[in-house]
Amino acid sequence: MTPQDFYRTLEEDGFSLSSKQKEQFDTYFKLLVEWNTKINLTAITEENEVYLKHFYDSIAPILQAFLANEPIKLLDIGAGAGFPSLPMKILFPNLEVTIIDSLNKRISFLTLLAQELGLENVHFFHGRAEDFGQDKAFRGQFDVVTARAVARMQVLSELTIPFLKIGGKLIALKAQAADQELEEAKNALCLLFGKVIKNHSYQLPNGDSRFITIVEKKKETPNKYPRKAGLPNKKPL
């Protein structure tokens, strides 16, 4: 998918990018490739692949009408090089984006990236989701939490749902069907008062299958969740 293919496909979906937005995606690509020589951000560095498998894939929830261009508070867990939240932010500038990442070098990259792209209302924090999930400044504060290929739903639910307001939604982007994952996550979702409201499949323009699972938070998360850093992965609920 060349940049021109990317713009054209978005236009067909009703999103006509401004010259500023096109510049932002171009700068994003160039900085990603440049910084990838210093720290491991991605195995995908060829331009056409980045536009398809990072940029297009990241904005899929917008293209599938699961997000609106409103000043909602969005948290991205394990965003790595900023996916999916920063491509979303370029397309929908009204989003207020927060990223938590456990590697300080990635936070340095994201901070510089946001400055170079001229993004406002973006916030970056270094640390573990389990720790921030017990911090009152973050717990129960977000309308949406996104996670792209971070962990199995059984683990992911404990890392994300505590951050949501009641009625808030987890948007999990997956490369494989989540049916088996959701079966395994039934107990975790029950304990965390999360309910699966959508399990959506679609295809990238090259035909690759992708999946989006949306979980709504129904009640306050019990205080003991998330557990200490590392436990959700070692001993899933």
Swiss-Prot record:
GO MF, any single term: rRNA (guanine-N7-)-methyltransferase activity
InterPro entries: rRNA_ssu_MeTfrase_G, SAM-dependent_MTases_sf
Annotated keywords: Cytoplasm, Methyltransferase, rRNA processing, S-adenosyl-L-methionine, Transferase
GO cellular component, one term: cytosol
Subcellular location: Cytoplasm
Residue spans crossing the bilayer: none
Matching Pfam families: GidB
Binding site for S-adenosyl-L-methionine: G78, F83, A129, E130, R148
EC number(s) on file: 2.1.1.-
Family statement drawn from the similarity comment of this UniProt entry: Belongs to the methyltransferase superfamily. RNA methyltransferase RsmG family.
Protein function: Specifically methylates the N7 position of a guanine in 16S rRNA.
Record protein name field: Ribosomal RNA small subunit methyltransferase G
